[in-house]
Regions:
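Walker A (P-loop) ATP-phosphate-binding motif of ABC ATPase nucleotide-binding domains
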Residues: 3
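Conserved lysine of the Walker
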Residues: 14
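A glycine- and Lys/Arg-enriched "phosphate-lid" helix/loop adjacent to the NTP-binding pocket
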Residues: 127-207
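NTP-dependent small-molecule kinase module
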Residues: 20-24, 28-29, 178-249
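Walker A (P-loop) phosphate-binding loop of P-loop NTPases
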Residues: 11
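ATP-dependent small-molecule kinase phosphotransfer cores
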Residues: 40-153
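Short glycine-/polar-rich loops that comprise or flank the Walker A/P-loop
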Residues: 56, 164-168, 219-222
């Protein structure tokens, strides 16, 4: 099994990376592509292992998910401008959504399909360390280490941190906040309005390359930095190269 996740600030190019890899695998045609996002949008739940075909698989997923707690996060908690949800509610919701996906779907699937399984993710526990961990630092004045420990103490996060970290994480980097804002204006669907202000985009973008975060991550996974400031083609090429590096070795 190979598990690769793409991370980065909003409008930073994660979607471009995932689409490029999905198209690459579709063109190869030697594996079945199972898009969990599409399944969740259609059926309103996580798939269980028996619903995956018995063939070489590429499984694609996103966090938050599009079902259950993840849908609540997308539709209400991240977008509700009338209610300022506490960082605790936000962090615990993400952690529960994460644990349900891995317990209901991936744990059994990995046992069944260990040799012929490639998993491609958009966001994961690193987003919780950056987004909710960053909120804890900015709102309470806690140190990075204190915020990290608080995030990782939540059962769903601890479960994933100790049992299901990806083999590699591709972090898209865009240092020009004006470019991020321009991309945001051009994008029709916005997933988390409260994090898409210029102030938050700057703070979050810096956190993804913070030496303390990267030091923690390097103990658990391999980090691949993607220069996403240039052309779409350049971003896609880097993403595919990372994917091939881990899935075709």
């Amino acid at each position: 099994m190979v598990h690769v996740v793409f991370e980065g600030v909003d409008f930073g190019g994660k979607g471009i990376c995932l689409k490029a890899i999905k198209d690459y695998e579709l063109n190869k045609g030697d594996k079945h592509i199972f898009d969990i996002d599409e399944f969740q949008n259609k059926f309103g739940r996580n798939p269980v292992p028996g619903e995956f075909p018995n063939s070489p698989l590429v499984v694609i997923y996103s966090e938050p998910t599009f079902a259950g707690v993840g849908k609540l996060l997308r539709d209400q908690i991240l977008k509700d401008k009338d209610v300022d949800h506490s960082v605790d509610i936000e962090a615990e919701a993400f952690a529960l959504d994460r644990r349900m996906l891995f317990e209901q779907t991936f744990r059994g699937l990995i046992t069944r399909s260990e040799k012929d399984l490639s998993i491609l993710g958009s966001r994961g526990i690193i987003s919780s360390l950056v987004y909710q961990g960053g909120r804890i630092v900015s709102e309470s004045g806690n140190s990075y280490n204190e915020a990290r420990d608080e995030i990782l103490s939540i059962p769903g996060n601890y479960y994933v941190w100790t049992n299901f970290m990806p083999d590699a994480v591709g972090i898209t980097v865009v240092n020009d906040v004006n470019q991020l804002l321009k991309r945001g204006e051009e994008r029709e669907k916005k997933d988390g309005a409260k994090y898409e202000t210029a102030e938050n985009l700057i703070r979050i973008s810096k956190m993804y390359t913070d030496p303390k975060l990267l030091e923690d991550l390097k103990r658990k996974t391999t980090i691949e930095i993607i220069d996403a400031e240039q052309s779409v083609d350049h971003t896609q090429s880097q993403a595919i190269d990372i994917w091939k590096k881990y899935t075709e070795r």
